[in-house]
Each structure stands twice: as C-alpha cells, then as structure tokens.
Amino acid sequence: MRPIVKWDPQKEESIKEEYHKYGEAKPDLCRNLGTICSYCEKTFQDDRDLHVEHIQPKKYKDANGNYIYAHLETVWSNFLLSCSTCNGPDNKGNKNVILGKCHLPHLNNTFLSLCYKAGGVVEVNPALNGDSAANAHNLLQLIGLNKGPKDSSLKDKRWLIRSEKWDIAQRYLDKYRNRRTDVDTIIDLAKGYGCWSIWFSVFKGYDEVRKALIEQFPGTAKDCFDAANHYEPINRNPDNLNDPV
C-alpha cells in the first residue's frame, strides 16, 4: 500500500482544517493524492467514483450508541480517498479505527506493512513482529485486502485486479530488461492501470523505475524509501520503539 503525505493546512493555503461539507474536500484530496484509492490503489479517471473516506467513521457508534467520531465529519485530518469497495460495508465501512492500533497510509510506511505477490495475494510483511505485525494485520483486516476468490463477493474483484496487474507488470519488466520499453512507458502504464505497490514490487532492483514511481505519483511519501539502498522501504516512525513502521 502506497505510503502518502497529506498536505498540511498550516502550509497549504488552499487546504482547510475543516470544511463546510466533507464532500467539498474531494478536489483538494485528488490534487494532493491523485484520483487513486488510498487503500487498494485503483485509479479513476473520474473523481465521482471516489469517496471522501472518513478514517474514523462518522457513523461509528460505541457501546452506548454514541457517534464518537461525529465531530471529525468535516475535518481534513480525518480524510482519505477510497473506492466504493474498500469503503463498503463488507470491508472498512463503519468499523472502529483506533489510531496507533492499525497502520494507515498517511501515518505509517504501509509499503513496509504488506507484501504483494503473484495471483493477487497480499500478506503482512513476514519481517515484521510485535506491534508492527499486529498493526499491519489490523490494516489488512480493516480493508479486507487479503480477500481472495473464495471469500470475496462477486462484486469484490480487487484480488483479480491485482492478479491481472501483476501479470502485466511482469510482462513489461521483461520488455524493460530487453530494452523494448522505457521508464516513461512504465509510469504511464502504472498510472493508467493502478496498483502502485505491484509495479513497485515487480521493479525491485530497477532504481530508475522505482524513483519515477515515487516522484510521479502525487502525494507519495518519499521519506519512506531509501534512495541509497535501491529505494527499499524504511521505517517512517523510527522513534516509536513499539511500532517504528
């Protein structure tokens, strides 16, 4: 999952700390992060297909029936972009999100949290342990990103999309190795097809491609990757001893 940096309302004049209606934040989110689902990384030509997603759901009710996040309904810091599947009732929906107990793409290096493989497989990074592994697992469960063909609804084709995009990326890796395509073409394909993490995974060892993927996708958290080590992911929160990811 692509780690992202959201614009700071204190530094970007066009960004409001709070909006009159949360839907008014969508153009700003799209300029900041691209017309891309912040979770499954599907790309959209039309931003009408994207939701302004409330990280802590506005309709979540606690045991006493209180909407404990209602005050965050129009607050910029509580927004990401999501497709209807990731934000749907079968996946994130109105699940409770406790900050610090679940990795999130604007707070953690979520490319380090998860591993992408052929066949549409997404798993918790086996190199993680302790709270880091638990919080990465919570992210996977929150979005339902690990659902495969046996446990996905007929409408949830995210695993199939990933599988298809993995195969496409592999084909273009072979072409790139044989100098039958170039970096610009790879980036154009990644932007058109989506699934940033798959392209970044498949092109491991090709620094010029990885560099372009980081730089040419708006909002990508550049500090989450080590340019001196083939743009491998690094901890985003090194001072957090319990969960540096």
Whereabouts are the PLM-identified features?
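C-terminal, charged low-complexity interaction regions
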Residues: H137-V245
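Short helix-capping and hinge/turn segments at secondary-structure transitions, especially at repeat
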Residues: G88-N91, G119, R171-D174, N178
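Class I S-adenosyl-L-methionine
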Residues: N91, N96-N146
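Histidine-centered nuclease catalytic patch
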Residues: K42-L81, D90-T110, L114
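Short, charged surface segments at domain edges that flank catalytic/cofactor-binding sites
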Residues: M1-Y39, K61-S77, A169, T185-I187
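Intrinsically disordered, low-complexity coil segments
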Residues: L29, K61-Y69, A127-A134, K147-K157
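Short, cysteine/histidine-rich loop/knuckle motifs that typically chelate Zn2+
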Residues: Y39-C40, T85
